Amino acid sequence: MILMKNLILILIFAAVGFNTMASNPVHVIITAGQSNTDGRTPNEDLPAYIKALATDTLAYAEGAYRYCQIAQNDGKGEFIPFWPRAKRSGKNNMWAFDAVTYYWLEQLLQEKFYVVKWAVGGTSIAPDYNASKGRFWSAAPEWLAQAKPTSDGGNSLLLSFIQEIDMCIDKTLSRLKDGYQIDAFLWHQGESDYAKSKDYYRNLKTMVAYVRMKKKKKTGKDYSR
């Protein structure tokens, strides 16, 4: 898979690591970013071991992973079996790096796990304060205070992401017999922040801290380490 230059892939672990004992809480991953998290490589270029899971052997637009369940950009908190599929208008049988990540996690865990994903192409963390349109991941307090989730007609992707996670917790994860644990935050994004690249680290750190804070408030668990 060929990725655009200057993209950043960050894996932020919120727990000690994966333990495959079935008696432990169910594993949950949260994933966010822009086009290269949503997926921009045709499914025809999927690795052969993923193509083997397809039910459509022409365009590889349909199929299902055995264990991975995903809620992706739906705002409803509903999980379905994962298959690489971009959330965009037009052709959406496209994949991103996480398709490979989830495949190998399946091989490791050999049990059901859940992914909450929100990804939109052409977006940035740093907001444009003068823009009437646009969608941003910013957690800057002064900007976030006046923002609304994109799922409600606003321009905050971060608030939409938080809403999606909370909905998934309320509708599914909190009802699991063995409980759940958010193990990791996958983030892949970068080039749309080029104009404010010097601020990128601080903006990303602030955004991650906001997600951790909201999850601690929601679950009572400390995700600060």
Each model region followed by its residue ranges:
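N-terminal secretory signal peptides that target proteins for export/translocation
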Residues: 1-4
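Sec-dependent N-terminal signal peptides
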Residues: 6-16
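Sec/Tat signal peptide C-region and signal peptidase I cleavage site
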Residues: 18-22
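Cell-envelope and extracellular/periplasmic
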Residues: 23-225
